[in-house]
Swiss-Prot record:
Free-text remark on how the cofactor is bound: Binds 1 divalent metal cation per subunit.
Protein name according to UniProt: 5'-nucleotidase SurE
Any Pfam family: SurE
Native source species: Natronomonas pharaonis (strain ATCC 35678 / DSM 2160 / CIP 103997 / JCM 8858 / NBRC 14720 / NCIMB 2260 / Gabara)
Cofactor: a divalent metal cation
Taxonomic path: Archaea, Methanobacteriati, Methanobacteriota, Stenosarchaea group, Halobacteria
Annotated spans, Disordered: 234-257
Localization terms from the record: Cytoplasm
Amino acid sequence: MDVLLTNDDGIDAVGIRALYDALAEVADVTAVAPADDQSAVGRQLSRTVELHDHELGYAVEGTPADCVIAGLGALDLDPDIVVAGCNEGANLGEYVLGRSGTVSAAVEAAFFGVPAIAASVYFPAGDVTIEEFDPDKTDFAEASRAVRYLVDNAIGAGVFDAADYLNVNAPLPPETGHAPMEITEPSHVYEMDGERDGETVRIQDHIWERMAEGTIPDPPGTDRRAVVEGRVSVSPLTAPHPTTGHEGLAGLAEKYQ
């Protein structure tokens, strides 16, 4: 089993190291990851990127999508699967799928026809913000365990016959035992807002505040509900694709002059 490993927190982040070490137990792993933090850049692309040798593989002066394209298109890598992560912070809900650099790396791999897994860890809100939180390798143990299991078994089980990629979100390790795994779908809840102050606008994501309060009405079976309640969420997803049944649009096109 050959794995191309990337992330959006940067190749020296603790999360990618934790995942690299876990995956190395079951696969040959080559990291092709950003040289620095590229969080929340989505599928942003560069025209050219510089590569640097790194003990884990290659550091790329570019985005997560750049890394996947470089790895699959220029570095002669032929992985069985692409893994992105492990992200420092959850990537939950439909609205983050196009924003997250971690998830976007998995989507980029899907367009290459390569199965992919995006992996993130949910850090419950406490006295510090996610920006102030300083995780260590043990915080990624549950996520690493889940991803290693999926990498080792998902292809053989036919998981990617129906899904292009998996979005995996894991809680912090429980005090005893391991978190169970649940197949989920992304939550529909969306609570972005903007607050104007003179010539500036503050962009606010109220989801994180409500997660801390435990007041988000996520129904059973959704990714955020599972993770907040201490389960590993696995959402099987497809890359963007055409839809059908657009009679109304067809009628408009016929009348267009």
